[in-house]
């Protein structure tokens, strides 16, 4: 089988959390373009339904929308059950939901800290382990987690200690699960995007000064685009990545090289 065929996801089933918009929307689109049926999982069900409709019309794949609070164990279990029942199985997933709260550490409240850790790290544990249980009992699968270059470096000038810590945690969780499940044919990897020009970032006037600083610091001199993450996730979900597990892929335009 040639490499292009090995990259295909024909007949496979999966889901993406935080997929109504931004990075998750693009990775869900990528999976569908590669031949998979995909569930768009998000708390904002109205936008998720619109996204599902757009992807289904563009790709001809079965795309469903599911409302889910990824920090709630029962809700995540219900979501995974729905994916399996409506799509007919579960071969891959992308745990992508996340938030960021910028505040100096000495001013950040404990509630703010817990909110970031809960959404960015605890939800990944729930998503991975609940999806993983199904995969472990059904021959294997591929799990992809969204970490961040913020797990490798300390971002400046914005203070975001909770976000940085949560993403470092995602990377170590990824490695831990990869080792535990390696012999059971469940692969677990993470992607660490740099500054990505999602709609929420580029449409916010108050972020323009920050974007200018980020671009000035970046070797490529620009933000990444969500579409530039599509190739890596398809690779990780596919048979082309059969020997790839426990790895973190930094896609940051060389931002973390210095």
Q: What is the predicted role of each segment?
A:
Residues 133, 179-183, 242:
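Alpha-helical segment proximal to the catalytic Tyr-Lys
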Residues 104-105, 109-117, 159, 214:
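Substrate-binding pocket helix/loop in short-chain dehydrogenase/reductase
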Residues 128, 166, 174:
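Active-site helix of classical SDR
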Residues 148:
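Residue(s) in the substrate-gating loop at a strand-loop-helix junction
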Residues 8-38:
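Canonical Rossmann dinucleotide-binding motif of NAD(H)/NADP(H)-dependent dehydrogenases/reductases
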Residues 218-229, 240:
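A conserved structural motif in NAD(P)-dependent oxidoreductases
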Residues 2-6, 234, 245-258:
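Short C-terminal tail/terminal secondary-structure segment
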């Amino acid at each position: 089988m040639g490499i292009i065929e090995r990259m295909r996801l024909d007949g496979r089933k999966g889901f993406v959390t935080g997929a109504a918009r931004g990075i998750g929307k693009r990775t869900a689109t990528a999976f569908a373009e590669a031949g998979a049926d995909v569930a768009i999982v998000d708390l904002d069900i109205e936008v998720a339904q619109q996204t599902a409709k757009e992807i289904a019309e563009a790709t001809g794949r079965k795309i469903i929308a599911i409302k889910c609070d990824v920090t709630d164990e029962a809700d995540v279990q219900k979501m995974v059950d729905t994916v399996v029942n409506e799509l007919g199985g579960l071969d891959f997933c992308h745990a992508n939901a996340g938030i960021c709260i910028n505040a100096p550490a000495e001013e950040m409240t404990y509630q703010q800290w817990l909110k970031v850790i809960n959404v960015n790290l605890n939800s990944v544990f729930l998503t991975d382990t609940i999806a993983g249980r199904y995969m472990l009992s059904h021959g294997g699968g591929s799990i992809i987690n969204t970490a961040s270059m913020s797990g490798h470096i300390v971002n400046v000038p914005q203070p975001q200690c909770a976000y940085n810590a949560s993403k470092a945690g995602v990377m170590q969780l990824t490695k831990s699960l990869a080792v535990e499940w390696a012999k059971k044919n469940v692969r677990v990897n993470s992607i660490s995007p740099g500054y990505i020009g999602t709609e929420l970032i580029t449409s916010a006037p108050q972020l323009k000064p920050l974007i200018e600083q980020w671009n000035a610091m970046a070797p490529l001199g620009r933000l990444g685009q969500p579409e530039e993450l599509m190739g890596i996730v398809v690779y990780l979900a596919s048979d082309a990545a059969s020997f790839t597990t426990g790895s973190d892929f930094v896609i940051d335009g060389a931002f973390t090289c210095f």
